[in-house]
Amino acid sequence: MQQKHKIASKCAPVRSRYPVMKPILAALVFLCFLPVKLFADNEVLIVADEFPAMQVLAGKLKAEENVTSQIVAQTNMPADLSRFAAALVYIHRDLGEPAEKAFIAYAKSGGKLIVLHHTISSGKRRNKEWFPFLGVTLPEGDVSQGGYQWTEGVTLDIVNLAPNHFITTNKVNYPAQIAFQAADSAAEKTLPGFTLTNSEVYINHVLSGTRTLLLGLKYTDARTGKLYMQSHAGWVMPSGKGWTIYLMSGHSARDFENPAFARIVANAVIWKP
């Protein structure tokens, strides 16, 4: 019994010799994990096939919100998108099936997918899952009968349809007040907005499913004189555990240099649903 007592007394000082180690180890564990979260919160993935406009956008995101952008082609996408705070897609030409599936899976798994400009366009009709996932149809036929039409080199107005939403309001300075009447409204309203020149407009998107309309467009066709006021220039919708945001503008770097539009894109990136 005496020997056991000696062993116990020898061991006791060992347990108390380094009382400071436990908090140090805890702090080290915390610091090891902290940079990973900060990195994820401050980096976005931009997948594009036209890069000058995205370089302008990346510069805006860095300057305004200290967000770092990784810009890649769809063939060079990381295998795992989940670490990015948002994935922005700016694809004019064909959207490959692997990228299509990756974007959809990212959003449904809890990611924030931001679909820009011509990532909704007639060429994407060939994709099996893209338009059904987005709840978008681009009808064929003449525009006067409701068919989809794109026109570039135009001047158009963009108006705020969601005066209480973070994406359309946070730090956004709308320089104009624009008369606008939505198709489902009996009355014309004056809404805050901005004008884009030498841009591109998409007419007659047909939307289905639940979403919040963010932006409307107002455009006069120079060839026919017809005035269009439509409500699909920006929207946000739930996608599984995540979200999908669409912004129609972005024809060229010039659109992303517009302060109001650049701020709206930045808001979409930092928005926390």
Give names to the regions the model predicted.
Residues 15-20:
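Short, Lys/Arg-enriched N-terminal segments with co-localized hydrophobic residues
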Residues 2-3, 21-24:
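Positively charged n-region of N-terminal signal peptides that target proteins for export
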Residues 55-64, 148-240:
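Catalytic beta-strand/loop cores that center a nucleophilic Ser/Cys/Thr
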Residues 42-125:
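Helical hinge/lid and interdomain linker segments adjacent to catalytic or ligand-binding clefts
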Residues 41-43, 52-53, 208, 218-273:
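Extracellular ligand-binding/catalytic regions of CAZymes and related secreted enzymes
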Residues 94-181:
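A glycine-rich, often tryptophan-bearing local segment used as a flexible ligand/cofactor-contacting loop or short
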Residues 26-37:
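Bacterial N-terminal signal peptides
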